[in-house]
């Protein structure tokens, strides 16, 4: 009986988990893992990761101080949160984790370099070596130039949102560690453009793109690794067996694990080296010319950057809401303690109706067990109801 497809694939390709979900990574035990803003934003809304969010927000508030504005707290927390998830992932995988630079910096070389250095600094502060982290950067001309600088500093880069052959060539010439061509998104574009429902097997345009890039890299001896990404079905994965790396979602990993069939290696360095190919070189103008001519790559890169920017904006909103709740709790705890201290005139740990400085109606509302006295928890419970109402109000803004 043949082994399952996942086991066979691991014998010829490095399997990477494409998820921000720590539990999924633990289930499939990949060598590496990749994350992106959309995955982290999704994970941030799952109850099992609430402690990571809360701990990060509290830590940043402590670091920046009580007077720091909410915007500064949230901006810093996003960087720290990406690294916090990365650290949890690195406790599971033996290899590398990819952490993405803010997509809003995709056309700013210097800002991308600065952000990458900061992220690596956060990892190093936590005791993680540089060789265990890949900094994900969009494959714009500006992003590729940033990666070229970072690679010379020993900061390894994963160039993402790669759709065109010209992007792959520029990345190889820049000496980046790894690229992530988006197989499924390329397929999506051609299906919409052509009106076809499917492109089976080797006809899949995304598969053809990765195959072309892989063969070119191996033919001309580029060290840059090719990691196929964004798969829509296991057929695409089967057609790219032998690629350096493939980053695969948990759902497709499970489907591969449940499928027993013989897996044939499709990509091979020896075959690539035997091909007749022409080597090309790109400067900024030639890159721009080719990018403009490749409508699919042009549109999908723009769409991908906008999508990741939207995910970051959403994450910022979620963190602002959560910070308001966390800091509201602290305020209410303090307020309850202050009110209790003022009213507990004899210091016996209770406030009687005679000691209460407010109205009888409020006292009766707080005295839930109707024993004629209030403790600090009674006050906190009453204020807590107000807090919950405030939290719901913030969530609807």
From Swiss-Prot:
Cited InterPro entries: Aldolase_TIM (IPR013785), EF-hand-dom_pair (IPR011992), EF_Hand_1_Ca_BS (IPR018247), EF_hand_dom (IPR002048), TAL/FSA (IPR001585), Transaldolase_1 (IPR004730), Transaldolase_AS (IPR018225)
Which enzyme class, named as a word?
Answer: transferase
GO biological process annotation, one example: carbohydrate metabolic process
At the top level of its lineage, which domain of life is listed? Bacteria
UniProt entry keywords in alphabetical sequence: Cytoplasm, Pentose shunt, Schiff base, Transferase
- For the keyword Aminoacyl-tRNA synthetase, the answer is no
**Gene3D superfamilies assigned:** Aldolase class I, EF-hand
Name the reaction it catalyses: D-sedoheptulose 7-phosphate + D-glyceraldehyde 3-phosphate = D-erythrose 4-phosphate + beta-D-fructose 6-phosphate
| The keyword NADP is annotated on this UniProt entry | no
Task: List the CDD domains.
Answer: EFh (cd00051), Transaldolase_TalAB (cd00957)
Please give the Pfam families that the UniProt record associates with this protein. Answer: EF-hand_5, TAL_FSA
Alphabetically, the GO molecular function entries are:
calcium ion binding; transaldolase activity
From the UniProt record, give the pathway where this protein acts: Carbohydrate degradation; pentose phosphate pathway; D-glyceraldehyde 3-phosphate and beta-D-fructose 6-phosphate from D-ribose 5-phosphate and D-xylulose 5-phosphate (non-oxidative stage): step 2/3
What Enzyme Commission number does this protein have?
2.2.1.2
In which compartments does the protein localize? Cytoplasm
Catalytic residues? 136 (schiff-base intermediate with substrate)
Span of the signal peptide: none
Q: Which GO terms describe its cellular component?
A: cytoplasm
Q: Name the protein family.
A: Belongs to the transaldolase family. Type 1 subfamily.
Function of the molecule: Transaldolase is important for the balance of metabolites in the pentose-phosphate pathway.
UniProt-listed PANTHER family: TRANSALDOLASE (PTHR10683:SF18)
Q: Do you know which NCBIfam families this protein is assigned to?
A: PRK12309.1, talAB
On subunit structure and binding partners, the annotation says: Homodimer.
Stated name of the protein: Transaldolase
Organism of origin is Synechococcus sp. (strain ATCC 27144 / PCC 6301 / SAUG 1402/1)
